[in-house]
């Protein structure tokens, strides 16, 4: 899986700057220079190649991927008070500090979500670079399954939110349980007011 490859790469390679790019010919390589410059000269810890602010929604022919990207981005930015414009992009640059402090837990495509949350939670410097996006070449099929991998990503967000912000996670869970209890209690209470019986 993708996460396993990233784990081994980060463990075995020592460098001042790392670039991660998907091998499906959807990301133009020329944006790499600007991303590397931000890491080496401006001490940025993670540079995010932002597809969503340029050509992604025009080029990508998979509508549920578009919806999923927007959902994941909105959820993470809301829960973690961040402003990462493209959570799921496979085009990123990293500093040595990021790579050597990142505990790779995911095995598959949810790795990008984990990277984004790690950087935000550790107060690392994150910047976005708007990049062009091309749809996959004809005959090239994505290994990403919209539904099963989408569910894994949402599950990863929930797990990491619980680990990084337990008060917020269990506070929301408690509020939900209180709401359910109140809904179940109201009919019983109304019956009691009318009849005096429970």
Annotate each PLM feature:
Residues 25-26:
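Acidic metal-phosphate-binding loop of nucleotide-sugar-dependent transferases
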Residues 21-22, 130:
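Short beta-strand segments
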Residues 2-13, 17-20, 29-109, 135-151:
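Acceptor/aglycone-binding surface of glycosyltransferases and processive sugar-polymer synthases
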Residues 34, 81, 105-107, 111-198:
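Hydrophobic helical membrane-anchoring modules
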